[in-house]
Amino acid sequence: GNRPVYIPPPRPPHPRL
């Protein structure tokens, strides 16, 4: 069987200072 690939949730873009 195929192993489920863990996909991390997309991180919000950090504000440029």
From Swiss-Prot:
It is found in: Secreted. This is Apidaecin. Its main location: secreted. It comes from the Eukaryota. Keywords: Antibiotic, Antimicrobial, Immunity, Innate immunity, Secreted. It comes from Bombus pascuorum. GO terms for biological process: defense response to bacterium; innate immune response. Belongs to the apidaecin family. Antibacterial peptide active against Gram-negative bacteria. InterPro entries: Apidaecin (IPR004828). Induction: By bacterial infection. Transmembrane segments: none annotated. GO terms for cellular component: extracellular region. It holds the Pfam family Apidaecin.
